[in-house]
């Protein structure tokens, strides 16, 4: 069958046998067979014979093969280290840093002032080149946007009721395990709201809940839910009331939440109190939170004053001499005489904290997690040391 099928196709055999290359008149060149020679060069070989077809197929590859140039380093020349632009930039002083250094030299800055930002020179998040300008801005803002004396304009609220509210908020803050920034912002919102509008006594705790809800949303990664605040208040208020108070607070403060609280200055001044260990840091925050309970200390003074006074009092208690260094004076902007009276007030609060009915702050700093700084012995000769 196979042979009969082949014999049935004579025209195919004729095509295969009869097609011959024709000469082009006047040129003496042969036509190229289909896929016989796809090159443009004339080799003079007979394509029809089929000889050297493989060689012709490889020939263009040999002619068009890219030349690889291998560069070998000179044996007598040493290899240069890899140049990193990022490393080069880090090792070079920026224009801002140069101007700041010249400004310090022009202002006659003493060598006794320690550069507390040197350890963060390579930390981009620390913003070392701008940190001094940032805190100068904070000092300006706290003077312009201070909280006015509002107790006289609140007929149903007095200083004692405010202290009770702050004591309860400290306890709620501890139970929710919130960040320190949240507590300071909460108290700031409470005082600012009270200075702007009248609040009834029965709504004072609701004000604290709304302020802490806002502070949590602003500072925390995982903020407690509204129902958590309803539960912590023993269902004294419902969800709708808490949300309504939140909206009212934001409206009164005009959504201005980014404010310099005492915590902002505490973080900076603790860093300036070199050397500073964990015990001293906890003691500074303990004294500062005791100050938050007192209306005159918080409302009638700037946040930076409370922070500086807490650092000074802590150094007195731990007998870190000198009590007020040139570094602290430079970064706080306060002299020792300016903060001494406020430090005495914090010391008195500390001495009476264990006997007070409002013991949330005392309990918070009596545990090992906070170095038990609330249990440190009192400093009887504090007034003598300050004299």
From Swiss-Prot:
Q: List the disulfide bonds.
A: none
The molecular function GO annotations come to: cyclin-dependent protein serine/threonine kinase regulator activity
Q: Where is this region: Disordered?
A: 1-29
Q: Which GO terms describe its biological process?
A: cell division; mitotic cell cycle phase transition
Instruction: Give the matching Pfam families.
Output: Cyclin_C, Cyclin_N
Asked if Manganese is a keyword of the record, the answer is no
Do the record's keywords include Cytoplasm? no
Q: Which keywords accompany this UniProt record?
A: Cell cycle, Cell division, Cyclin
Superkingdom of the organism of origin: Eukaryota
* CDD domains, per database record: CYCLIN_AtCycB-like_rpt1 (cd20567), CYCLIN_AtCycB-like_rpt2 (cd20511)
InterPro entries per record? Cyclin, Cyclin-like_dom, Cyclin-like_sf, Cyclin_A/B-like, Cyclin_C-dom, Cyclin_N, Cyclins_cyclin-box
Which PROSITE patterns does the annotation name? CYCLINS (PS00292)
The similarity comment for this entry is:
Belongs to the cyclin family. Cyclin AB subfamily.
Instruction: Output this protein's name.
Output: Cyclin-B1-4
Top-down, what is the taxonomic lineage of the species of origin? Answer: Eukaryota, Viridiplantae, Streptophyta, Embryophyta, Tracheophyta
């Amino acid at each position: 069958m196979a042979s009969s099928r082949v014999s049935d196709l004579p025209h195919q055999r004729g095509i295969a046998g009869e097609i011959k290359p024709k000469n082009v008149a006047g040129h003496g060149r042969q036509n190229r067979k289909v896929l016989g020679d796809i090159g443009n060069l004339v080799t003079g070989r007979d394509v029809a014979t089929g000889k050297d077809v493989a060689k012709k197929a490889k020939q263009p590859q040999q002619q068009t093969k890219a030349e690889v140039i291998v560069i070998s380093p000179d044996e007598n020349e040493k290899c240069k280290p890899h140049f990193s632009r990022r490393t080069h930039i880090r090792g070079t002083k920026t224009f801002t840093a140069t101007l700041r250094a010249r400004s310090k030299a022009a202002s006659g800055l003493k060598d006794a002032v320690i550069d507390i930002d040197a350890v963060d020179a390579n930390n981009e998040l620390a913003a070392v080149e701008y940190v001094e300008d940032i805190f100068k801005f904070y000092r300006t803002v706290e003077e312009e946007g201070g909280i006015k004396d509002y107790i006289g304009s609140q007929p149903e609220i007095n200083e004692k009721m405010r202290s009770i509210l702050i004591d309860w908020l400290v306890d709620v803050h501890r139970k929710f395990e919130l960040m320190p920034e949240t507590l300071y912002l909460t108290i700031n919102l409470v005082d600012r709201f009270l200075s702007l509008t009248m609040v009834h006594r029965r709504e004072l705790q609701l004000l604290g809940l709304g302020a802490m809800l806002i502070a949590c949303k602003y500072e925390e990664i995982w903020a407690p839910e509204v129902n958590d605040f309803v539960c912590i208040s023993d269902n004294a208020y419902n969800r709708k009331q808490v949300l309504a108070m939140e909206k009212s607070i934001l409206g009164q403060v005009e959504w201005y939440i980014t404010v310099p609280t005492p915590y902002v200055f505490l973080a900076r001044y603790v860093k300036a109190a070199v050397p500073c260990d964990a015990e001293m840091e906890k003691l500074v925050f303990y004294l500062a939170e005791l100050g938050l309970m007192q209306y005159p200390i918080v409302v009638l003074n700037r946040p930076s004053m409370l922070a500086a006074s807490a650092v000074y009092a802590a150094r007195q208690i731990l007998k870190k001499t000198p009590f007020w260094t040139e570094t602290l004076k430079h970064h706080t902007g306060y002299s020792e005489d300016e903060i001494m009276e406020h430090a005495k007030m914090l010391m008195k609060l500390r001495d009476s904290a264990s006997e007070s009915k409002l013991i949330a702050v005392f309990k918070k700093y009596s545990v090992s997690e906070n170095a038990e700084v609330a249990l440190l012995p009192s400093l009887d000769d504090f007034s003598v040391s300050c004299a």
